[in-house]
Each structure stands twice: as structure tokens, then as C-alpha cells.
Amino acid sequence: MGVKSVRFSIWFLFVVTDLVFCRTLSGDPDPCDATNQREFQKLRSDQITVLINGYSEYRIPLLQTIVASYSSSSIVSSILVLWGNPSTPDQLLDQLYQNLTQYSPGSASISLIQQSSSSLNARFLPRSSVDTRAVLICDDDVEIDQRSLEFAFSVWKSNPDRLVGTFVRSHGFDLQGKEWIYTVHPDKYSIVLTKFMMMKQDYLFEYSCKGGVEMEEMRMIVDQMRNCEDILMNFVAADRLRAGPIMVGAERVRDWGDARNEEVEERVRDVGLSSRRVEHRKRRGNCIREFHRVMGKMPLMYSYGKVVNSVGEQGLCRKAGKLVFCDRD
């Protein structure tokens, strides 16, 4: 083999490796450059890109497990770990990068992107490396089974303009206080959380690059509150579509960050803002009121029920002295 051939082989190996496993600082130079945006119809429709937000060093072992799970799914094209803690030592990120590449069993490409700031808005930046129509926005403390992931994707493909997720909340209007609030209703919802939020890639550009002065002010509110980027994305999607999100049922979703966990290490469980529930709900209510003030309207719309991946008998029959579903023995 000649010198030119050897050089070509080394260059080719480097490029292929960089495509599969990549650690970079920040992202695209100008994520809002419209010339970098691909036409929706030319993007892959058979797979998704997973964007995982990471911040806490205590959650790194859990993050590695979650990335490995996503990478083993055949519907995942690539995984971008968006590290939002600027104070994390480079040595620790280097080790994380090595572990992600070494212990992730699937064929999905994996990138570790060190964000230039801790802004929660950065998780919605358009990224030129994303080559799929659908993106999954998720947190570093939620683990979902593969069948439920695939089912959520199938629901999204039938409703590509809607936000699809497994965790939902709602806005409401407090008649006594005469103000908008953040709440939970037992029979309706209007907000999908970024614990698991599937959506079309176009919404990244819509959130980060459009909307003019109004949208810029609302993104500033997210930075000031250090919260509510998911609520703002729901405002963006609902305002564009005039429809609410879709909740999908899941067989198994482990939420390690839920404050109600009893046997999870505190440093892992209590990292998230949602662990401080009363304060968290008030702050998010403030966000809803501020977004409403800036927009001059309330675009959020209610959805009812959830989509499930199985259809069983609903009729009841008496068997062995008990009322049970008729298709059960």
C-alpha cells in the first residue's frame, strides 16, 4: 500500500469514527441560519434522533444506562447528549464520552455536546446533524421500555404536527385569584413534559429562531426562571397547530427524578427542579402567566384521554363468583 493509500485509509477511519462517536464543544456556529435547515420531506421518516439533556454529575451512571437503552433501539438513528453544566471538568466529560462509546450496544451514533451555557433554551436549538423528521426531547432521569418508545413513534407518525409524550400536565384558570395556573387535571391535559417529548424537527427552528421580539422575550423568561422551556414549546406548537398534545400509554417508564421515590439516592432524585413540588408549581404558574402576557392570548388547548397500544375486552362477565373482563379466564 502506497503513502497516499495509507493517508486515505487513516483519514477515512477518522471520519467514520467521528460520525459514530463525537464529542464537541457547543453546537453549530449559527443554529438559526436558514440555509442549514433541511427540507422536511428529505429527512428520514423511519427513525428518530434522541436529544438528552444532562447536567448533574451525580446522574452520570444513570445517563449512561439510559443512552445504552436508546442506542439499542432499531428506530434510533442518533443520540445527542447535550451537557448543560459549564463547570463540569473536561476530564470527567472525557470519561463520560469514553463510557458512552464503549458500553452502548446499538448502532446509533452518539455525540456528547458540551453546551456553552446552562440555558434550558439550548435543548431546543436546531442542529444540522439531525437527519430525521422526528426528534425525542428527554431528560437524564427517565428510562422507557423499547416497545413503548416504538409505540410513541408510531403515534407521532400518524400525527406529525402534534407533541407526543408520556408525562402530561395542564394549565387552568383560578377563578378566585383570577389568574392562570399550572396544575394537574384527572381528565384532561394541555402540556407535555420534556421528560419524554416527541415532535417534528421543525419546532426546534420555530422555538429558537422565529417569533420575533415576542419569542425572544419569552425565551428570556425561561432563562430568568431557569424553568418552563417545555411549557413554552407547548405554547409554540399549540399556537401553530390550534390543537393540544397527545398522551401515549407506556408499559414501563421509570422516573428516577420523581420526588416520591423512596429508595433512590437523594443526590440523584433531588437534582431536578420538580423535586421541590410546591415551589416548582408556583414558578411554572408564573411562567404561564408571563407567556400569556407577552402573547396576549392563551394558545394552550386541552386534550382528553390517552392512546394505548392494546385493545382488550371491556365487557364484564361473572366468573367464579367475580366480575372480570369477559376475555379473561
UniProtKB/Swiss-Prot annotation:
Keyword Membrane included in the entry's annotation: no
Residue sites binding substrate per the record: 118-123, 139-141, 169, 226-230, 271-284
Keyword Signal: yes
EC number(s) reported in the record: 2.4.1.-
Catalytic residue positions: 230
BP GO annotations: protein glycosylation
Region described as Substrate binding: 268-284
Residues bearing attached sugar chains per UniProt: 99
Binding residues for Mn(2+): 141
GO cellular component, one term: membrane
Family from the record: Belongs to the glycosyltransferase 64 family.
Listed name of the protein: Glycosyltransferase family protein 64 C3
Annotated organism of origin: Arabidopsis thaliana
